[in-house]
Amino acid sequence: MALAKRIIPCLDVDNGRVVKGVKFENIRDAGDPVEIARRYDEQGADEITFLDITASVDGRDTTLHTVERMASQVFIPLTVGGGVRTVQDIRNLLNAGADKVSINTAAVFNPEFVGEAAQHFGSQCIVVAIDAKKVSGPGEAPRWEIFTHGGRKPTGLDAVEWAKKMEGLGAGEILLTSMDQDGMKNGFDLGVTRAISDALGIPVIASGGVGNLQHLADGIIEGHASAVLAASIFHFGEYTVPEAKAYMAQRGIVVR
């Protein structure tokens, strides 16, 4: 029996409001995170991912408060990320009601933090978020590099090798965003999604670029992802989660 593939709406939250940009810029307001999360829960989303994109020191308490409000009203798994740097940050988020915590930049600067987090809390609640950009030229073997700081800073790290290293340290899941595709609405980068999904034994969540329901199905069928994440197609009412599930089921994908 094939494992059901998950559909995960993503809330990018800036100072307590859900926003959506293109390639991490041109941000527009999409509403109150708790209201939006509740709507997705009612629609039958499998999980919700909440990424605090301000993640500044002053934004921390707002975030914990929002997570508490969300967890009290939403009864599907909640992954929270953004500015997670210490074991205490993870503990605070789990105590506030997060089911999983996503580590991004901190993993690049201190890979051992991922191992420490997995030992403390178990791999099942540690997600490593990877922002990858294609760096190979025409005619070269495809290669993707990890970028940090919202896609602004190159790290020199190969995305596939890095993902394998994170799995080895105890990450339970990889949240893979294509920086080239983010907000462009012309589909996931299926090359990097497939390369990383095929290299790992843990689930990979495809993110960045969904513009229609076909793209969600492609992430699973062609990208070999375990789950697909989308924001703007759901936030702005173009499609609903039930429509996405019905479409994927028609394509022969097992959904919950």
Curated annotation (Swiss-Prot):
Cytoplasm is among the record's keywords: yes
InterPro entries noted in UniProt: Aldolase_TIM, His_biosynth, HisF, IGPS_HisA/HisF, RibuloseP-bd_barrel
Subcellular location: Cytoplasm
Its EC number(s): 4.3.2.10
Catalysed reaction equations from the record: 5-[(5-phospho-1-deoxy-D-ribulos-1-ylimino)methylamino]-1-(5-phospho-beta-D-ribosyl)imidazole-4-carboxamide + L-glutamine = D-erythro-1-(imidazol-4-yl)glycerol 3-phosphate + 5-amino-1-(5-phospho-beta-D-ribosyl)imidazole-4-carboxamide + L-glutamate + H(+)
Top class in the EC scheme: lyase
Keyword Lyase among UniProt keywords: yes
Biological process annotations from GO: L-histidine biosynthetic process
The entry's keywords: Amino-acid biosynthesis, Cytoplasm, Histidine biosynthesis, Lyase
Gene3D superfamilies reported in the protein's UniProt record: Aldolase class I
Pathway(s) served: Amino-acid biosynthesis; L-histidine biosynthesis; L-histidine from 5-phospho-alpha-D-ribose 1-diphosphate: step 5/9
Record-annotated active site: 12, 131
Protein family membership: Belongs to the HisA/HisF family.
NCBIfam families attached to this UniProt entry: hisF
PANTHER family membership: IMIDAZOLE GLYCEROL PHOSPHATE SYNTHASE HISHF, IMIDAZOLE GLYCEROL PHOSPHATE SYNTHASE SUBUNIT HISF/H IGP SYNTHASE SUBUNIT HISF/H
Role: IGPS catalyzes the conversion of PRFAR and glutamine to IGP, AICAR and glutamate. The HisF subunit catalyzes the cyclization activity that produces IGP and AICAR from PRFAR using the ammonia provided by the HisH subunit.
Subunit annotation: Heterodimer of HisH and HisF.
UniProt protein name: Imidazole glycerol phosphate synthase subunit HisF
High-level lineage: Bacteria, Pseudomonadati, Pseudomonadota, Gammaproteobacteria, Pseudomonadales
